[in-house]
């Protein structure tokens, strides 16, 4: 059945900002969808609020709107563009919920827009817990005993009927948000309360606990002729109770019997038919009892999901691409398999290798968060590895996580019986470190029965881990490392570093082991991912390494450039770096064979047809060097680009160069000039530029000396980190003493992992009340091109990755911009940059200070590119390959005159706002972790607001980042520190003029009353122990108060917005309780005066709801006209 001819234009909704449970996989799926639609001659209208995505590049759609995914905005775009159809199944839960809201508001009917990919009814049946339960029953399958609740009273009745433990699952949420396992009434009330709040339909499913059962997933696709294929079965190594996104998962399934698998297939096919997904894909999760084989259907996603991306990368079967074609009316037998180019999509993929996915967590960013893994997803990223067997695949996946001590290690003394007993107790509770603890217990003598009893991980997987330990012990104890033994170690997934440690050689021994391995002729070979277990030839070069006999690499003629990706998403190194890598691949592919190396299954860069060759491999020195050596034999290699993937590839630069690998762009020595504090100080000195007073320290005594010389407050951080990890503002000796030991230990441990010499602790003068600026620029050795000058909305002290910023800057003078331009030129020249550089500055009392410089792609490059209409990373790639800025102006990649530092009257304003994951992280007693922003980055993603002026653009950024955006009326609670009280009267007057009622604590109300400003007084909250947010709460009744504290009012829904600035010492007493309650209630809250002032401007601007909606294609045309007029 050929495609439908009545659909001429399609609107695609993206997934918005990267959040836990919904990450880069939807950029991958959305990009595939846009490419398919355009290939089919269909006009594409794309809406997504996330600028750091490939799908929002202007060439991906005919009209691209970087706008909030909110019903009023979507209606404006629909009214303007008049699409024939809406495709919501490739943008995660955000797009599904947006489509449902448009349907319920009558917008789709009003503008005659058809929903394709899944109907509203199918979405409802798949997402609504009660309706889905009926579908499962009708399919002849079994659900866990369960009931629906919409209130805590109903929840209690269900608990009486079923008993504990109980699983809470909200309707219409993603990543298990608001879900959890309750073992008693207190936990049930806490989890169910959150679940009801986060569900847009105020609905939760309460079901019997099935913890410890085995968990499986099926990815299915169905066309309108009722053809169904099972793309990939996935097995969770962790049993039911840990969210699949937080579990180690494998494909194919290892512990299912053939009969069980066939039964899962039959149930899955019956469910996809029953739900009504007839032009797309879905993901279904099952639980299987380990002894009886009883099967329970857990849930489904009637859309492309995170697991779909994993299944696509694991098999080479492009689920999102095929789902888009199905939505257009094609059938599975009409769609060709791109990889074989000879089989149809109705052929189910077969794999002859093992795929393992390992999650990456960020608990270190959220002190106090409960590290227990539950049904609510907490991981921020994931890595995937392919190999010939499970042991090798697991070892590769664990080292792909790129986190200290995430691979198995046998350092130190063998655990004692007492320690083994402690470890067995610890692994009862699933945490990020469970597998490392489990291996240590095995090393110490724990039996398989003991480990199974503690974890309920299937014995098949445990046996494999026991075998890895057995091999490690053989390596450790052998007199000599024979070729046979070294190969056995490799087949067990052990890296050269792990073997070196087992042999007592430490990190330095990695080179010794590699040289020995090469002497033995023991090198990995590279196999092809072909979807058909080598039944047909693969046309696409998508490779993984393993220790087998024959390589499948093919010779090539063109010179190649190898680009190192950024690995798993994490806080501080996210999708922005994949964006720059993809741009480099796209641009350099015109003249070179591009070779991509990455291990993140969520990303566009790991799409099989994005580069000329794709290596799905860990980003470690060993793995990258082997790829380079293998590619050298296949054809000429110009070099490796390490500048685009963030800190991970950058940390390999020096060792790769020392091993004879040519590094393109900025050299490792030049990178060191910017990152080594002493060397960078010399660069600034020559350029006659100011830096905050600073010192370095390798001991507490040195740190004290430096802090006293500089003067408090100081900013303390380890060297060579990304995302401000370990960074803190310190106000006195006591705080410094507490910080130093931990920070020093982290810095030294990191240097061991990255192969660097021990690096010092950096101590800077903290610039209070300064304006912070980010500058992204290109430099070719002679000419500078400013990509963008971004002014932070918050004052200095908030990490640039968490700060809101505006481009063009809103308060900088022409003279200040000139000084920024001259300073950036001097730094780029002094550091011998070739390619991208990011410099962070601060203006304090009109004195310009340089905070730091990074000679690499920064996380603001995508934002600056979208705001200025210039693909900076594409130009950077060509400069790294030896071309000049003048060449890029000539070929049209850069503006013929001027650059992104020029401000044109009438230019649209872009505001970047960060999205923070605080609602995901709770303390052991259920409170959210504190949201105070500081110098350590904690955001997972970003959005962009785009409009005619700063107030409108800022309002859009808030609407995109937070459900509902900013209120235009209602009640505002204000509590500010003593320093901020002098700015309070003007703010309060503005609030009154805008029609808000003010609520305040006694001290703040007293200040306001002196200026004749009325406010309602609320009781103050304080905790007995200032630093302990879990301490019991005492309430102090203030004179004239309403008899309630602000937390009571927030919980009663009587507060609409909060300004709560902490005192300078970061006291967490009152502020913590207020901020935690506000997170639970999803209220807009501000912890800096400057951002609250911006919010007031925004509220004033949007009271009339007159947003300007402009596509980025229209924006680029407008910019070009303004530039032409000016020059």
Curated annotation (Swiss-Prot):
Residues 133-328, 681-881 form the ATP-grasp domain. This is Carbamoyl phosphate synthase large chain. Large subunit of the glutamine-dependent carbamoyl phosphate synthetase (CPSase). CPSase catalyzes the formation of carbamoyl phosphate from the ammonia moiety of glutamine, carbonate, and phosphate donated by ATP, constituting the first step of 2 biosynthetic pathways, one leading to arginine and/or urea and the other to pyrimidine nucleotides. ATP 1 binds at residues 129, 169, 175-176, 208, 210, 215, 241-243, 285, 299. Mn(2+) 3 binds at residues 840, 852. Belongs to the CarB family. ATP 2 binds at residues 717, 765, 767, 772, 797-800, 840, 852. Mg(2+) 4 binds at residues 852, 854.
């Amino acid at each position: 059945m050929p495609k439908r001819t009545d659909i001429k234009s399609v609107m695609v909704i993206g997934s918005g900002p990267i959040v836990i449970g919904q990450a880069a996989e939807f950029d991958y799926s959305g990009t595939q969808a846009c490419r398919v639609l355009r290939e089919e001659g269909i006009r594409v209208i794309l809406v997504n609020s996330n600028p750091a995505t490939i799908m929002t590049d202007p060439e991906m759609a005919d009209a691209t709107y970087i706008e909030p995914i909110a019903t009023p905005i979507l209606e404006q775009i629909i009214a303007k563009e008049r699409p024939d159809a809406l495709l919501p199944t490739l943008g995660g839960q955000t797009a599904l919920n947006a489509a449902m809201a448009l349907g319920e508001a009558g917008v789709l009917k009003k503008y005659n827009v058809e929903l394709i990919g899944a109907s509203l009814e199918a979405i409802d049946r798949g997402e609504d817990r009660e309706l889905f339960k009926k579908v499962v029953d009708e399919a002849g399958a079994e659900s866990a005993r369960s009931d629906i609740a919409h209130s805590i009273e109903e929840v209690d009745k269900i608990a009486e009927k079923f008993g504990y433990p109980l699983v809470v699952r909200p309707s219409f949420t993603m990543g298990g948000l608001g879900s959890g396992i309750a073992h008693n009434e207190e936990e049930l009330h806490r989890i169910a309360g959150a679940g009801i709040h986060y569900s847009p339909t105020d609905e939760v499913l309460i079901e019997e606990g099935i913890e410890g059962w085995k968990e499986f997933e099926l990815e299915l696709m169905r066309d309108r002729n009722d053809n169904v294929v099972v793309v990939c079965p996935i097995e969770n190594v962790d049993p039911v109770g840990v969210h699949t996104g937080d579990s180690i998962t494998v494909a194919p399934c290892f512990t299912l019997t053939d009969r069980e698998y066939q039964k899962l297939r039959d149930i899955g096919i019956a469910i996809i038919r029953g739900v009504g997904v007839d032009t797309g894909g879905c993901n279904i999760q099952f639980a299987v009892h380990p002894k009886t084989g009883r099967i329970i259907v857990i849930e489904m996603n009637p859309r492309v999901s995170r697991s779909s991306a994993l299944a696509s990368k694991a098999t080479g079967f492009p689920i999102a691409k095929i789902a888009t074609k199905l939505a257009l009316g094609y059938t599975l037998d009409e769609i060709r398999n791109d990889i074989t180019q000879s089989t149809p999509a109705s052929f189910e993929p077969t794999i002859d290798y093992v795929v393992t996915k390992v999650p990456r967590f960020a608990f270190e960013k959220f002190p106090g968060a409960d590290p227990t893994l539950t049904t609510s997803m907490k991981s921020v990223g994931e890595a995937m590895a392919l190999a010939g067997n499970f042991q090798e695949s697991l070892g590769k996946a664990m080292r792909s996580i790129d986190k200290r001590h995430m691979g198995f290690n046998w350092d130190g003394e063998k655990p004692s019986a007492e320690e083994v007993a402690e470890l067995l107790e610890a692994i009862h509770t699933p945490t990020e470190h469970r597998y490392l603890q489990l291996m240590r217990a095995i090393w110490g003598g724990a039996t398989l029965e003991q480990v199974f009893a503690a974890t309920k991980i299937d014995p098949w997987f445990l046996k494999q881990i026991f075998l890895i330990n057995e091999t490690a012990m053989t390596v450790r104890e052998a007199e000599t490392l024979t070729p046979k033994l070294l190969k056995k170690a490799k087949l067990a997934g052990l890296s050269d570093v792990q073997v070196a440690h087992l042999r007592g050689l430490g990190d330095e021994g990695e080179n010794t082991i590699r040289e020995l391995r090469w002497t033995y002729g023991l090198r990995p070979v590279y196999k092809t991912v072909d979807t058909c277990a080598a039944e047909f030839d693969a046309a696409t070069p998508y490779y993984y390494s393993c220790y087998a006999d024959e390589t499948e690499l093919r010779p090539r003629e063109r010179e190649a450039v190898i680009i190192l990706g950024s690995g798993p998403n994490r806080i501080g190194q996210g999708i922005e770096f994949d964006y720059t890598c993809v741009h480099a691949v796209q641009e350099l592919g015109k003249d070179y064979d591009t070779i991509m190396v990455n291990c993140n299954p969520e990303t566009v860069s790991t799409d099989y047809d994005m580069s000329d060759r794709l290596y799905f491999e860990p980003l470690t020195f060993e793995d990258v060097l082997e790829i380079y050596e293998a590619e050298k034999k296949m054809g000429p290699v110009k070099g490796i680009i390490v500048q685009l993937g963030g800190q991970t590839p950058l940390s390999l630069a020096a060792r790769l160069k020392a091993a004879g690998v040519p590094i393109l762009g900025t050299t490792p020595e030049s990178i060191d000039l910017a990152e080594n504090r002493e060397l960078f100080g010399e660069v600034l000195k020559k350029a006659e530029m100011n830096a905050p007073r600073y010192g370095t320290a390798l001991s507490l005594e040195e740190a004290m000396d430096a802090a006293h010389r500089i003067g408090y407050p100081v900013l303390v951080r380890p060297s060579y980190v990304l995302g401000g990890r370990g960074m803190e503002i310190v106000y006195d000796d006591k705080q410094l003493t507490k910080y130093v030991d931990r920070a020093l230990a982290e810095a030294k441990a990191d240097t061991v992992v990255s192969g660097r010499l021990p690096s010092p602790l950096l101590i800077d003068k903290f610039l209070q009340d300064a304006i912070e600026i980010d500058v992204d620029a290109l430099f070719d050795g002679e000419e500078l091109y400013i990509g963008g000058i971004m002014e932070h909305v918050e004052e200095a002290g908030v990490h640039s990755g968490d700060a809101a910023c505006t481009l063009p800057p809103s308060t900088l003078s022409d003279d200040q911009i000139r000084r920024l331009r001259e300073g950036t030129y001097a730094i780029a020249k002094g550091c011998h940059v070739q390619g991208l550089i990011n410099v962070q500055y601060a203006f304090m009392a009109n004195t310009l200070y340089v905070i730091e410089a990074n000679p690499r792609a920064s996380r603001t490059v995508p934002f600056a590119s979208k705001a200025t209409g210039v693909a900076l990373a594409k130009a950077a790639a060509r400069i790294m390959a030896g071309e000049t800025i003048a060449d890029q102006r000539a070929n049209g990649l850069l503006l013929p005159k001027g650059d992104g530092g020029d401000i044109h009257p009438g230019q649209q304003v872009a505001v970047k706002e960060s999205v923070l994951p605080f609602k995901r992280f709770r303390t052991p007693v259920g409170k959210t972790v504190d949201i105070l922003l500081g110098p350590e980055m904690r955001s997972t993603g970003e959005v962009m607001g785009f409009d005619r002026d700063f107030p409108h653009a800022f309002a859009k950024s808030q609407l995109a980042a937070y459900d509902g955006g900013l209120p235009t009326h209602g009640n505002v609670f204000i509590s500010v520190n003593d320093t901020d009280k002098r700015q309070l009267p003007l703010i309060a007057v503005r609030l009154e003029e805008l029609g808000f009622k003010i609520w305040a604590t006694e001290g703040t109300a007293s200040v306001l009353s002196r200026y004749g400003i009325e406010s309602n007084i609320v009781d103050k909250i304080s905790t007995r122990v200032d630093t302990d947010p879990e301490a019991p709460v005492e309430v102090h009744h203030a004179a004239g108060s309403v008899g309630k504290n602000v937390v009571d009012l927030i919980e009663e829904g009587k507060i609409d917005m909060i300004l709560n600035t902490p005192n300078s010492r970061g006291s967490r007493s009152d502020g913590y309780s207020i901020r935690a309650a506000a997170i639970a209630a999803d209220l807009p809250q501000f912890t800096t005066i400057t951002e609250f002032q911006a919010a007031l401007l925004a509220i004033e601007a949007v009271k009339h709801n007159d947003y300007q909606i402009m596509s980025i294609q229209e924006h680029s045309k407008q910019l070009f006209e303004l530039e032409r007029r000016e020059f």
